[in-house]
A protein has these predicted regions:
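Short, solvent-exposed loop/beta-turn-alpha elements that line the ligand-binding surface or hinge
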Residues: 39, 121-132, 199, 216-240, ...
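Extracytoplasmic ligand-binding clamshell segments of periplasmic binding protein
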Residues: 219-296
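Extracytoplasmic/periplasmic solute-binding protein
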Residues: 147-151, 181-239
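Short, low-complexity disordered leader/linker segments with a strong preference
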Residues: 1-46, 68, 438-447
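Extracytoplasmic "Venus flytrap"/periplasmic binding protein-like
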Residues: 65-132, 167-175, 272-274, 281-282, ...
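Hinge/lid segment of periplasmic solute-binding proteins
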Residues: 105-157, 181, 306
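Extracytoplasmic/periplasmic substrate-recognition and gating elements
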Residues: 64, 295-361
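C-terminal capping/gating helix-and-loop segments adjacent to ligand/active sites or protein-protein/ligand interfaces
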Residues: 361-362, 367, 382-438
């Protein structure tokens, strides 16, 4: 997200600002149940999230649809990447938002452990049971209680490429990880570096690792590592780092080499492939690449910007890594009724369809008609996410305590940047990751 899904585009451009939405007239009956559709009139719902730029603009349309439906005014506050710190300071200052769009499972769990959250309503729970794969309920729950509704998801197992670059090199979308590296070297030989890697943003490197690890080590090991039930010094981690290091150490594969990758942020990596002066043929990241290629560089998705699924590594299965933003209700918010009604609204395909029509969005809600998405590529990625069901695995770094998996210049982000700079010793990197993880989990458990 975040960060990331997601959140990724928004986190890369995050600005701290607060926008107000003007109240609209009463509309149909509120999703809160009963009444004349105006029972929330006079209330102002404050929603905090990481989004800015195009993502914030599109989410505002969802807020406006809620206003039209219920009469409640809305106000969005952008937190930037440090959601936990910003929300904590607002709670301490007596100015807590009513709803927070949380981009990390670890942060949601942290909020619940601190007793900041309200359990979701029965109506929302019923919608989740009916219309979401069980994995999404699991990621939104703490100790069996549902606190988070996943409204926006990301398919983070997509590799985006320039069809022109592939045509020039005479290569096709690869079916395996080894084929992807071979195709990349062929693209490089044709005159254009293979991959634009956004090494300046450490979260993109965690996504690279997670796809390799899920495919190579398998979902059981992935779950164990995500929960720190095995150590980062496990041989499976070292092997995944070795696999990733083969890419990071190959100057034919990285636009600008390791130094260039470390100086490239996420928006810059997309620009290197789809901008006016291409510097690479491929960029790995989630489906949200499409929104940026379209909005920022005017590319026709499916024609001038295409993707292939992140290919399987060795004998493993193709990975499906996801991320997402979960809506939670804060106990200290001043408008509990409006907050609960808003989450009931977000649980409907009606709410998801508002953003789906704008692009840069996927919903884990199975009840959303795929025809709501604005183009065939989005429909394809959305179907892949839904069809994966419980084989989807949530972004591992987002499940970790923020000190390890979600802090710029620290923990996993920094250590994988160090590994990109020098990938010669995977075992040493694994040991450093374990030391940082052990410290972060110990602190989180004490808290």
């Amino acid at each position: 997200m975040r960060r990331r899904i997601r959140t990724a585009y928004g986190s890369a451009l995050a600005l701290t600002l607060a926008l107000g939405a003007a109240a609209c007239g009463g509309g149909p009956v509120s999703t809160a149940g009963g009444g004349d559709g105006k029972e929330l009139a006079g209330q102002t719902l404050t929603v905090a999230g990481v989004w800015s730029g195009a993502e914030q603009k599109n989410f505002q349309k969802v807020l406006d649809a809620f206003t039209e439906k219920t009469g409640a005014k809305t106000r969005f506050v952008s937190t930037g990447d440090n959601v936990s710190t910003v929300v904590g300071s607002k709670i301490e200052g007596g100015n807590a938002p009513d709803v927070v769009m949380v981009p990390q499972v670890g942060v949601l769990q942290q909020f619940a452990q601190r007793k900041w959250l309200q359990p979701l309503s029965e109506k929302t729970r019923q919608a989740v049971d009916a219309d979401y794969a069980p994995v999404w309920k699991s990621y939104g729950s703490v100790d069996g209680t549902l606190y988070g509704l996943y409204f926006k998801a990301a398919h983070k197992s997509t590799v985006w490429y320039s069809p022109e670059a592939f045509e020039q090199a005479g290569v096709r979308p690869p079916a395996t990880y080894a084929e992807m590296l071979t195709a990349g070297r062929t693209v490089s030989d044709s005159g254009l570096p293979a991959f634009a890697v956004a090494g300046e943003d450490g979260w993109t490197l965690t996504d690279w690792f997670e796809n390799v690890y899920l495919s190579q080590a398998g979902p059981q090991k992935y779950d164990q590592l995500a929960q720190h039930r095995i150590k980062w010094t496990d041989p499976s981690v070292v092997e995944a780092l070795r696999t990733l290091g083969a890419l990071f150490s190959d100057k034919k594969l990285l636009a600008g080499g390791q130094k260039g990758a470390l100086a490239t942020d996420f928006p810059g990596s997309v620009e290197k492939v789809f901008g006016p002066e291409p510097e690479a043929g491929m960029v790995y990241e989630g489906d949200f690449v499409a929104g940026m290629a379209k909005d920022e560089f005017g590319k026709k998705i499916g024609e001038e910007a295409k993707f292939f699924p992140f290919p399987p590594v060795g004998k493993g299965a193709a990975p499906v890594v996801s991320g997402g933003d979960a809506a939670v209700v804060l106990k200290d918010g001043k408008n509990q009724k409006a907050a609960m009604a808003f989450l009931e609204f977000l649980a409907t395909p009606e709410a998801a369809a508002v953003w789906a029509a704008e692009g840069g969005f996927l919903s884990p809600n199975k009840a959303l008609d795929l025809g709501a998405y604005s183009d065939a590529t989005l429909r394809s990625t959305a179907k892949s996410l839904i069809d994966a069901g419980d084989t989807v695995r949530f972004d591992m770094s987002d499940q970790a305590p923020a000190a390890f998996g979600g802090t710029k210049g620290a923990g996993e982000w920094k250590l994988l940047q160090d590994f990109l700079r020098d990938p010669s010793d995977p075992a040493r990197t694994a040991a450093a990751l374990e030391a940082a993880a052990a410290k972060a989990y110990q602190t989180a458990n004490q808290g």
